[in-house]
Each structure stands twice: as structure tokens, then as C-alpha cells.
A protein has these predicted regions:
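Inter-motif core of Ras-like GTPase G domains
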Residues: 17-27, 201-204
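Active-site beta-alpha connecting loops in nucleotide-dependent enzymes
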Residues: 156, 184, 191-260, 266, ...
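A glycine-rich beta-strand to alpha-helix segment
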Residues: 272-303
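Short gly/ser/thr-rich secondary-structure transition/capping motifs
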Residues: 2-7, 39-43, 155-156, 212-215, ...
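Short, structured coil segments at secondary-structure junctions
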Residues: 17, 73-75, 227, 260
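Structural beta-sheet core signal
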Residues: 21, 60, 80, 204-206, ...
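Acidic, Mg2+-coordinating active-site environments of NTP-dependent enzymes
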Residues: 22-174, 253-254
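Switch II (G3) loop of P-loop NTPases
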Residues: 1-9, 175-181
Length: 311
């Protein structure tokens, strides 16, 4: 099998001719490509799924509202998964233990739940794993191969990547790097960090990605980022866009502060980050580097040297 990870960002997934498809969620993003028209955005997903052959099911997450709303519009076989009571493959008894997630999957026509583990924290990763298992089961892959493959899966780069320890004169912090840059992605990553490190403080360094995304989801970002225990904001990574007034790091910080959520620190020069971190990090903190821009370069530099001095 050839497995392709694709998204709707530029609608290029419409050129694929998949034999099976797995849809995890449908939520407004990349709207600049669709000229802000959500109906066009949904039409892209419909077109993608209608590229499936008549015998190829769409495996879809019933926990996601966008997915649930789309299912009645499809003229293809649909197999569902998730925690939802009506899911064909139902995720149950989820629990987190460190950087691992454990759950059971209740399958159609099988009396015994399938006990599964995946080496990534967070309910969203358990949901994604459930979707992968559902698709494998529909392909006829053996139960033993599914359990073994999932247990051996090491994750993908920049998705809650554990990059080890970062040290400075007063102690060390655990470095986690994550690519998520949509409010929902940031929210589930924060929750995963709480699940994995429930007795440790999470210090988030967040780099907003695109002025249009920051503008379009401003209130959502304020609510989600306000949940961090300590927040450092970098300037927006423009990705070729022109600046938009009120859609920058300073505006986010003011809105978070005005709601009394926390007191963010804004850094306009990335060379200042090391000094700021040295002043706010405590021993055993979790340093969560979050965003899709060049913040990944900063994470890599920290991981390579194991020291704040690398910045």
C-alpha cells in the first residue's frame, strides 16, 4: 500500500485518486485559497471523497461536527470511528500514561474490545489511531499486525516531538516541539502536554502563522492561548502575507491580558528568546515550542546543543 497524508490547503488533494480515504476533521482553515467561502471549502472535501471508487469506503471521525455534517451529502460507503456512541469503531476507556495513550476499540461484529497503545499522548492521537485501525480492519489486515504496528509507531516529526532536555544554569526543562498552528491544534496539544506531564508546568512559546489565520481565528486563539500556564509570543510568521492591523502578536497579548487570563511576554527579536527563557523557566518545566513557521529551527537548535545558549 502507498499511504499519502494530504490536506485541503491548496485543493491539490482533488488530483488524488485514492482507493480508501480517512478524514479526521473538517474545520475552517486555509480559507485564503477558497476566497473566504466556506461552501467552496466543503465542496472540496465532497469532491475529494467522490473520487473514491464505489467499493472504497470513506473512514470518517464521527466525533467531529464538520465530518458529521458532511456525511449525509456523500454518495459513497462511509465507515465511522470515534468516541461517539454511533461510531462503527468506537473508542473507549482512553487513558494517558506519560507519553503513551491507551484505549480500547469496540468493533462491529466483534464481541471483545481490542486493547491498543500508541506512543503519543493526547486524546486526539488516540482518535487518529482509532481511525487508522478502522481503515486497516476494513482492508483485512490481521489483528496481530494492527496491534504490533501501532505499538511500534514512533510518531512523525514536529507533532509533539520529544526532543530531550534543555539545560541552563538553574536546571533543565523537557523540550517538546509541535507544528500545530490552528486554534484546535494548539488546544489539543496543550491538553496532551497536561495529560503527559500533569504535575509539571508547561511554558509555551507560540509563533502565530499567517496574518489571515490570526485575524480569522483571533478570538479562538485568545481563548486557547490563555489556557497556557506561561505564554511567550513570537511575531507572526507571515508566509508571504502582508501585515494586517490587529492580527499580530501584540494584539493577541493585549486581548489575552484584557480578559485576565495571563500575562503573555511578546518577543519581537528571536535573539531575545534565550534570555527570556532563562528568566522564566524553572527546573522540570515543560518547554512547548508551537507553530508552523521558523520556530522549528529554534527547536532544532535547542535540541542539537541541549542548552539555551544555542539561541
Amino acid at each position: 500500500y502507498l499511504v499519502v497524508e494530504a490536506d485541503e490547503s491548496d485543493a491539490s488533494f482533488l488530483h488524488l485518486q485514492p482507493m480508501r480515504a480517512l478524514v479526521t476533521n473538517i474545520e475552517a482553515d486555509h480559507m485564503e485559497h477558497y476566497e473566504g467561502d466556506f461552501s467552496r471549502y466543503i465542496q472540496a472535501f465532497t469532491g475529494f471523497l467522490h473520487n473514491l471508487p464505489f467499493y472504497g469506503p470513506a473512514v470518517m471521525c464521527l466525533d467531529d461536527k464538520g465530518v458529521r455534517d458532511l456525511i449525509p451529502e456523500l454518495s459513497r460507503q462511509v465507515v465511522t470511528y470515534g468516541r461517539h456512541a454511533d461510531a462503527d469503531y468506537r473508542l473507549d476507556n482512553y487513558r494517558s500514561a506519560g507519553l503513551c495513550s491507551h484505549f480500547e476499540l469496540i468493533r462491529p461484529h466483534d464481541a471483545a474490545p481490542l486493547a491498543l497503545s500508541v506512543n503519543m499522548p493526547g486524546l486526539h492521537n488516540a482518535q487518529n489511531a482509532a481511525g487508522a485501525v478502522a481503515l486497516c480492519a476494513e482492508l483485512g489486515i490481521s489483528e496481530d499486525a494492527i496491534v504490533r504496528g501501532l505499538a511500534e509507531f514512533g510518531g512523525v516529526g514536529r507533532r509533539f516531538s520529544d526532543l530531550g532536555e534543555v539545560r541552563w544554569s538553574a536546571g533543565s526543562a523537557r523540550l517538546i516541539d509541535d507544528y500545530g498552528h490552528h486554534p484546535t491544534e494548539v488546544a489539543v496539544t496543550l491538553q496532551a502536554a497536561r495529560d503527559a506531564f500533569h504535575d509539571q508546568r508547561v511554558v509555551m512559546v507560540y509563533q502565530p502563522h499567517r496574518f489571515t489565520r490570526t485575524r480569522d481565528h483571533f478570538d479562538e486563539f485568545v481563548s486557547v492561548l490563555g489556557e497556557a500556564q506561561f505564554l511567550i509570543l513570537l511575531d507572526v510568521y507571515a508566509a508571504g502575507e502582508s501585515a494586517i492591523e490587529g492580527a499580530d502578536a501584540q494584539s493577541l497579548a493585549r486581548a489575552i491580558r484584557a480578559r485576565g487570563l495571563l500575562e503573555p511576554v511578546v518577543i519581537s527579536d528571536q535573539r531575545q528568546l534565550a534570555a527570556v527563557l532563562a528568566g522564566v523557566l524553572c527546573d522540570r518545566d515543560i518547554l512547548l515550542m508551537q507553530g508552523a513557521g521558523d520556530i522549528g529551527r529554534l527547536s532544532a537548535a535547542l535540541a542539537d546543543s541541549d542548552s539555551l545558549e544555542a539561541l
